[in-house]
């Protein structure tokens, strides 16, 4: 049975679905920029949860939203002399590229906030009619003091809250509130900004109400699992609970799961510290998608993930060994050695077959038990390594000894081990990658890094510029600075 740590109860609990279909909602991105390593960590973790539920014979409906109206999007549109919709659509496309590259299954539904305005307004109206919301000059606010259970997810004491903790508020908003802890459900339209009609006049929804409305519209009033990063526990998820349970008089979610944050060399990842890395930058620098995925899986999803060059290099080496094992059939086929097919005249001793089948069944049980234990991916990877090791050893021997002969028992062992390795790596979303013979990177990756280096030099971040130059040199590329704005390159 699957056991998960529930942030709401602060305990590991046995997972018991409400109905035949497990209903999951995951908070999605605000689409104003490319995704960073924190997004990779979060969405890989929840992809494992979804895959494991399916592997465990559950039916799953998985919904993840896009916040496509927000101050950050409007600011980016102004910077780019673009529109809110153009910025959103561009970054939604880029989001899919990154997630597809990392092997993350697309959600069953990905609603956009702007497509749910009518439902959001209806939701707010219910809160207003029940006395949980009040109007101030075209804005609508939720009154947290009307909810005696407010703070149950985060253990926040309302009276001790800092006004700044409510997130995404302005000084103008704080001056309109009955209490500093209240939060916006609807924001009055500003001049020259996109807005929507509502019972309270033109405006746009607050951040928190979007998810409450979309959860109800897509999955119903009570769902099985709600997902997100630990940075969303307060205020976002606390406010979701307040809104939804006030409006519906029902529990919003039975299980709340939160992933830990990403640190870089022991420090919190942030743009201000200049240690901020996008998924795109990392992949363009030569890190393979499955290396990044493997790296994320080495640490329990609830713990902080410390991103260092050394840890990534270690993950790369470990993944290469598994990837070689997953290439068994490709490698042996080239030399006309048939392992993949069970030939009609192939005889395998029954006692040997029983022994191998038992060994493999035990590994599958250990793998399942690891993931049953609050998604212990490190424990699951240990079993993957046990399966990959004999395959890797055989490949080394096969490549070293010409015309290597193996008997039918050995073929059976290799074939069944390989099939199991494929099955279990699929649960972890680890897919075979083309084996790279040398350390070369392609031209698009080189140009992307050159542009990133030019940007670093423009910001006078010469340490980052030197780091990129050295990285390219390791990959066999020499940079030639023709001018402050022009850099050419040659392979060496």
Curated annotation (Swiss-Prot):
UniProt-listed Enzyme Commission number(s): 6.1.1.16
Source organism superkingdom: Bacteria
Cofactors: Zn(2+)
A single Gene Ontology CC term: cytosol
Entry note: cofactor: Binds 1 zinc ion per subunit.
Catalysed reactions, as listed in the record: tRNA(Cys) + L-cysteine + ATP = L-cysteinyl-tRNA(Cys) + AMP + diphosphate
Motif ('KMSKS' region): 268-272
GO MF, one annotated term: ATP binding
Pfam families, alphabetized: DALR_2, tRNA-synt_1e
GO biological process: cysteinyl-tRNA aminoacylation
InterPro entries: Cys-tRNA-ligase, Cys-tRNA-synt_Ia_DALR, Cys-tRNA/MSH_ligase, Rossmann-like_a/b/a_fold, tRNA-synt_1_cat_dom, tRNAsynth_Ia_anticodon-bd
Entry similarity comment: Belongs to the class-I aminoacyl-tRNA synthetase family.
Protein name per the record: Cysteine--tRNA ligase
């Amino acid at each position: 049975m699957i056991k998960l740590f529930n942030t709401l109860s602060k305990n590991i609990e046995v997972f018991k679905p409400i109905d035949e279909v497990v209903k999951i909602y995951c908070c999605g991105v605000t689409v104003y920029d490319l995704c960073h390593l924190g997004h990779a960590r979060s969405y890989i973790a929840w992809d494992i949860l979804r895959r494991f539920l399916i592997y465990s014979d559950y039916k799953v409906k998985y919904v993840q939203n896009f916040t496509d109206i927000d101050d950050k999007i409007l600011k980016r549109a102004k910077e780019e002399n673009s529109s809110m919709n153009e910025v959103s659509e561009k970054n939604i496309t880029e989001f899919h590229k990154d997630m597809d590259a990392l092997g993350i299954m697309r959600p069953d539904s990905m609603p956009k906030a702007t497509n749910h305005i009518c439902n959001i307004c209806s939701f707010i109206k219910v809160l207003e009619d029940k006395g949980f919301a009040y109007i101030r000059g075209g804005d609508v606010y939720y009154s947290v003091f009307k909810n005696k259970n407010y703070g149950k997810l985060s253990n926040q004491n309302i009276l001790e809250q800092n006004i700044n903790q409510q997130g995404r508020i302005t000084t103008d908003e704080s001056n309109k509130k009955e209490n500093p802890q209240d939060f916006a459900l609807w924001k009055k339209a500003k001049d020259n900004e996109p807005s929507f009609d509502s019972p309270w006049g033109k405006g746009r929804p607050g951040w928190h109400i979007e998810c409450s409305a979309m959860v109800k519209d897509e999955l119903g009033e009570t769902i099985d699992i709600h997902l997100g990063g630990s940075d969303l526990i307060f205020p976002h998820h606390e406010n979701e609970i307040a809104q939804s349970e006030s409006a519906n008089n029902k529990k919003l979610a039975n299980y709340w799961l939160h992933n830990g944050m990403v640190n870089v060399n022991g420090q919190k990842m942030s743009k201000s510290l200049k240690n901020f890395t996008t998924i795109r930058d990392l992949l363009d620098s030569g890190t393979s998608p499955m290396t990044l995925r493997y790296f994320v899986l080495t640490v329990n999803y609830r713990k902080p993930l410390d991103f260092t060059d050394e840890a990534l290099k270690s993950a790369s080496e470990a993944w290469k060994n598994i990837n070689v094992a997953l290439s068994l059939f490709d490698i042996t086929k080239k030399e006309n050695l048939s392992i993949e097919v069970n030939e009609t005249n192939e005889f395998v001793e029954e006692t040997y077959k029983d022994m191998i089948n038992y060994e493999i069944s035990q590994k599958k049980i250990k793998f399942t038990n690891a993931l049953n234990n609050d998604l212990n991916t490190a424990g699951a990877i240990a079993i993957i390594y046990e399966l990959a090791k004999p395959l890797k050893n055989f490949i080394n021997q096969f490549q070293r000894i010409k015309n290597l002969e193996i008997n039918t028992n050995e073929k059976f062992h290799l074939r069944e081990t390989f099939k199991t390795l494929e099955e279990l790596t699929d649960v972890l979303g680890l897919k075979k990658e083309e084996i790279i013979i040398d350390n070369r990177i392609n031209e698009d990756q080189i140009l992307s890094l050159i542009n990133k280096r030019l940007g670093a030099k423009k910001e006078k971040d010469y340490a980052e510029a030197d780091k990129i130059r050295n990285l390219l040199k390791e990959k066999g590329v020499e940079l030639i600075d023709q001018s402050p704005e022009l850099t050419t390159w040659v392979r060496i």
